[in-house]
Regions:
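Short, acidic, metal-binding catalytic loop of nucleotide-sugar glycosyltransferases
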Residues: 23-32
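Short beta-strand/loop segment that forms part of the nucleotide-sugar
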Residues: 9, 32-41, 60-63
Length: 305
């Protein structure tokens, strides 16, 4: 017995990478699948690449409402039992589909399977292992430990609990995992399934302030309060971006606490008063904790998280 996979790729001006994505999908074996690419009207070499493979996949190129809208369109245009969503700059590793199919076939109660992924550079070279963790929904609220191309889910999840939130620009995958995870436990497959492209021009890395703002906003809407970990992550990104604007090398700053302290120098009038008290390591630690706490509550008041 086999399951039919539906593979969906949203695309926009990723001509330098999309052929590698396509080849990684078409190289999958022992699994029946159909492949749909929803392009948003690319103006680079993307369409030439798609035409090259059009006898082995389906594609459409037209204006859309963004990445989430393109994925939703692809899901609606396919009929497979298992949905695999991979962006146009990522890759699957050999036998990924067959490994995932084995779980879905032998454990019919499992609705979502996820595995390990690598961060890779523009030349497909290994950077680091994505920090995937065993399933824990409470932990998922604190940190997104699922790498998007390494997640596969049954179509019934879409039918029962909806598709991607097309109003989100960055964290539509994280929101979907939180929504689905509230309904069922995900199966953690300890296998390397995908490579996620990690470079400066990726949407997530290139717009970090907007990404973290949207994540906090989404979490507040879903859980009425954004976890402290995400608020402080947003604070750290704000400080780093501020340093870049000032033309300084963020990597040379000593610690995250120092970054936050410096940011607070402009945010709080009491900075000089408490800094003068920092005469011993223990006092410095107490002051740093106070700074972070005050900054944390100030940030919540400013961004309403």
């Amino acid at each position: 017995m086999t399951l039919n996979f539906s593979v969906v790729t949203p695309s926009y001006n990723q001509g330098q990478f999309i052929e590698r994505t396509i080849q990684s999908v078409l190289a999958q074996t022992d699994v029946a699948f159909d492949y749909m690419i929803c392009d948003g009207g690319s103006t680079d070499e993307t369409l030439d690449v798609l035409k090259k493979y059009q006898d082995r996949l389906r594609w459409v190129s037209e204006p859309d409402g963004g990445q989430a809208d393109a994925v939703n369109k692809g899901i609606r245009s396919t009929r497979g039992d298992i949905i695999a969503w991979i962006n146009s700059d990522d890759v699957y590793y050999p036998e990924a589909f067959s490994k995932v199919q084995r779980i879905f076939l032998t454990q019919p109660e499992v609705q979502v399977v996820y595995g390990h992924a690598n961060h890779i550079d523009q030349e497909d070279k290994f950077i680091e292992l994505y920090p995937t963790e065993p399933w824990n929904y409470r932990r998922l609220r604190e940190v997104c430990f699922l790498c998007q191309p390494a997640v596969f889910f049954r179509r019934r999840m879409v039918k029962d609990y909806g598709d991607l939130d097309a109003d989100l620009r960055f964290c539509m995958d994280y929101e979907l995992w939180l929504r689905y995870g509230k309904q069922t436990d995900f199966f953690y497959l300890s296998e390397l399934l995908a490579g996620s492209r990690f470079y400066h021009d990726t949407k997530t890395l290139g717009q970090r302030v907007a990404v973290h703002y949207e994540i906090n906003d989404m979490l507040k809407a879903k859980f009425f309060r954004s976890p402290e970990r995400w608020v402080l992550a947003y604070a750290s990104v704000l400080v780093e971006e501020r340093e870049k604007v000032k033309g300084r090398d963020v990597g040379n700053l000593l610690t995250p606490v120092q970054r936050i302290n410096e940011f607070c120098a402009e945010a709080f009038h009491g900075y000089r008063r408490w800094r003068n008290l920092a005469v011993s390591p223990s006092t410095i630690w107490q002051v740093s904790r106070w700074t972070i706490a005050v900054y944390y509550h100030w940030l919540r008041s400013k961004v309403n998280f």
